[in-house]
UniProtKB/Swiss-Prot annotation:
PANTHER family: ASPARTATE 1-DECARBOXYLASE. GO terms for biological process: alanine biosynthetic process; pantothenate biosynthetic process. It comes from Methylobacillus flagellatus (strain ATCC 51484 / DSM 6875 / VKM B-1610 / KT). GO terms for molecular function: aspartate 1-decarboxylase activity. Pathway: Cofactor biosynthesis; (R)-pantothenate biosynthesis; beta-alanine from L-aspartate: step 1/1. Its EC number is 4.1.1.11. The keyword NAD does not apply. It catalyses: L-aspartate + H(+) = beta-alanine + CO2. The lineage of its organism: Bacteria, Pseudomonadati, Pseudomonadota, Betaproteobacteria, Nitrosomonadales. This is Aspartate 1-decarboxylase. It comes from the Bacteria. Heterooctamer of four alpha and four beta subunits. Keywords: Autocatalytic cleavage, Cytoplasm, Decarboxylase, Lyase, Pantothenate biosynthesis, Pyruvate, Schiff base, Zymogen. The keyword Transport does not apply. One of its GO terms (cellular component) is cytosol.
């Protein structure tokens, strides 16, 4: 049996650009792609914290250390500059692979610079 698990997450990145006429996808600062182990052209799910939109697209590379998060093409109608996004990828793992499984979680500041990286989400308490 395989289980689909959260593989990587960019948590609360800020949209810097929204380009309706650009060829689709989401451009992401190359340093963030590497930190989260997201490959160029990999499928990503985007969750817009500001308006609740959830959509799927693919990642493309933006200039390293630029802080760019640009939502492009038709998806530009789902996010505006300044919106907070969660960008996630998922992968399927066998039970044996799950023994070594750890997601790559990347947390950023207001300028989309890495401030913290973890491999677990803290337990939610009452």
């Amino acid at each position: 049996m395989q289980r689909t698990m959260l593989k990587s997450k960019l948590h609360r990145v800020h949209v810097t650009h929204s380009e309706l006429d650009y060829e689709g996808s989401c451009a992401i600062d190359e340093a963030l792609l590497e930190a989260a182990d997201i490959k160029e052209y990999q499928q990503i799910d985007i969750y817009n914290v500001n308006n609740g939109e959830r959509f799927t697209t693919y990642a493309i590379r933006a200039e390293r250390n630029s802080g760019i998060i640009s939502v492009n093409g038709a998806a530009a109608r789902k996010a505006s500059p300044g919106d907070l996004l969660i960008i996630a990828t998922y992968a399927s793992y066998t039970e044996a692979e799950l023994a070594q499984f750890k997601p790559q979680l990347v947390y950023v500041d207001a300028d989309n610079r890495i401030k913290n990286q973890r491999q677990h989400i803290p337990v939610q308490a009452a």
